[in-house]
């Protein structure tokens, strides 16, 4: 998965806004549904399911309870327009898929995960993974080719207001986006926390009356927030220092663009 922030910017949605969370929720619900249907089709064709399928919640049907109670009701007109012409499964569709999987099985035990996609996103001219961009124009130091500069994908006067740096966004909003996807993903996601060493004034209410310096307490509060919301993993914590350095970035020596 990559390009989510680019999708938001090109459709003039702010990262972490209610409509961006709604889009993420529905998009990954669709991804879940259609990968389940594809895995069920393969299981039928090959007459084989993953090991211990009969002991899984897919077989008992418990897995589908969250999808079979109500139909999707769009809250945002913009999100509704984005999905116009795309088949959004109804609760009846989910019930039919639930029955088909109970009868014929699933070929894949694991289907979905979100990788960091740091380098590959540049090649594809889109934003990395599900997280926000870090700069409007990003500088990368490649060991073999020297410095390379990458503007935010589809950067224009229209998209610029929606390309806010990850370091200037409340990390709870980033977690909200990831959790909206996590509901539909059976494995973990490369959820990265982007923190300034000097936190923006007023961003986190628990800092009121305290130093704005980032501390381990701040990280613990955010980790607990992510856990309570249902995130399965946190990948990295990247820190932007007062010297304009990034610490903790996933710099792979063997990866070049």
Residue ranges of predicted features:
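Catalytic alpha/beta core of large soluble enzyme barrels
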Residues: 64, 80-92, 99-246, 251-257
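Internal maturation/activation junctions in enzymes
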Residues: 13-117, 189-190
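Catalytic phosphate/nucleotide-handling subdomain of diverse soluble enzymes
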Residues: 7-11, 15-38, 125-150
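Core structural elements
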Residues: 1-12, 184
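Glycine-centered flexibility motif
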Residues: 3, 47-49, 69, 129, ...
């Amino acid at each position: 998965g990559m390009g989510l922030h680019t999708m938001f910017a090109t459709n003039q949605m702010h990262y972490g806004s209610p409509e961006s969370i709604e889009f993420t929720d529905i998009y990954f619900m669709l991804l879940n549904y259609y990968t389940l249907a594809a895995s069920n089709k393969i299981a039928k064709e090959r007459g084989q399911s993953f090991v211990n399928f009969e002991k899984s919640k897919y077989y008992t049907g418990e897995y589908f309870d969250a999808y079979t109670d109500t139909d999707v009701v769009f809250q945002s007109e913009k999100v509704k327009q984005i999905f116009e012409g795309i088949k959004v499964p109804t609760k009846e569709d989910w019930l039919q898929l639930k029955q088909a999987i109970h009868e014929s099985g699933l070929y894949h035990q694991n289907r979905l995960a979100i990788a960091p996609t740091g380098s590959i996103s540049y090649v594809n001219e889109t934003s990395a993974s599900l997280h926000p961009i870090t700069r409007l124009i990003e500088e990368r130091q490649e060991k073999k080719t020297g410095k390379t500069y990458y503007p935010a994908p589809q950067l224009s006067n229209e998209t610029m207001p929606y390309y806010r740096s990850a370091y200037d966004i409340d990390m709870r909003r980033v977690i909200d986006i990831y959790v909206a996807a996590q509901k539909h993903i059976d494995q973990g996601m490369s959820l990265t926390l982007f923190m300034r060493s000097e936190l923006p004034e007023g961003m986190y209410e628990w800092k009121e009356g305290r130093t704005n310096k980032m501390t381990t307490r701040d990280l613990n509060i955010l980790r607990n927030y992510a856990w309570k919301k249902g995130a399965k993993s946190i990948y990295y914590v990247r820190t932007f220092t007062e010297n304009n350095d990034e610490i903790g970035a996933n710099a792979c020596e063997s990866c070049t663009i």
